[in-house]
Amino acid sequence: MNERMKVWLVEFSNGERIARVGKYEAWKSGAEYIRDTYNALIAEAAAENDREAVRSITVEGLKALTEFKTASVRRGNFECDPLVRVTELEVY
């Protein structure tokens, strides 16, 4: 019984790693991490009443999500450097 299965290893900048069955699930996990990371930075800037930083971080976050989504539509591995890396693996 040599069945192969594809899984996607999602590695986060905080050192956490998870495996997902399905590329969409891997992308979803990565996108959620990117959103959470940028939302924390936005909240920190908002607490300091730094509107320019809030705007700038929001724009950067949207760019990061867009780049991550664009990278995910290609075959194979994709990442949002340095926050998330997704590696396609075959498991036997």
Model-inferred region functions:
Residues 2-16:
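Short aromatic-glycine-(Arg/Gly/Cys) micro-motifs in beta-strand/loop hairpins
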Residues 13-32:
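A short, exposed loop/beta-hairpin motif centered on an aromatic-Gly-Thr core
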Residues 36-92:
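Short, mixed-charge low-complexity intrinsically disordered segments
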